[in-house]
């Protein structure tokens, strides 16, 4: 999984994913996406009813695998998408894909005025912790694995 997500070039990853999709799912990417994901209209309806949508990156890349220019593009693209959903001010929040980020990510989120960043670090938030590195508990952290 990590090889596919971070080591291989985007070109090769895309080709492999398309082949896997064709061979094992037997459905084209557009149809599958439509059945799995919410439409823009559904998201807007949820927002109008008080739901908050934060960001998870535009392309769900490991941020630390991207250089500063690529991270900037990823972040500005997702801000543009969120702007197309909200018709009023909203809080920019980030839930790091795979829990992965680096100092460059934090600098860019600060530059773009993100108000919150959620990590995958399993611990309780303390008032001295960075607001862009908020730890959180996963439900899997509470129950022993059998």
What are the language-model segments listed below?
Residues 9, 27, 32, 42, ...:
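Generic structural signal for short, flexible, solvent-exposed coil/loop and linker residues
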Residues 59-62:
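A short, flexible beta-alpha/helix-coil linker loop
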């Amino acid at each position: 999984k990590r090889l596919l997500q971070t080591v291989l070039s985007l070109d090769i990853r895309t080709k492999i994913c398309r082949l896997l999709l064709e061979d094992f799912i037997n459905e084209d990417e557009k149809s599958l996406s439509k059945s799995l994901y919410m439409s823009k209209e559904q998201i807007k309806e949820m927002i109008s009813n008080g739901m908050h949508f934060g960001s998870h990156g535009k392309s769900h890349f490991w941020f630390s695998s991207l250089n500063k220019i690529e991270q900037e593009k990823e972040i500005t693209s997702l801000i543009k998408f969120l702007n197309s959903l909200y018709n009023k001010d909203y809080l920019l929040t980030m839930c790091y894909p795979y829990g992965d980020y680096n100092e460059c990510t934090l600098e860019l989120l600060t530059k773009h005025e993100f108000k919150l960043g959620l990590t995958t670090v399993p611990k309780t938030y303390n008032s001295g912790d960075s607001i862009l590195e908020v730890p959180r508990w996963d439900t899997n952290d509470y129950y022993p694995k059998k």
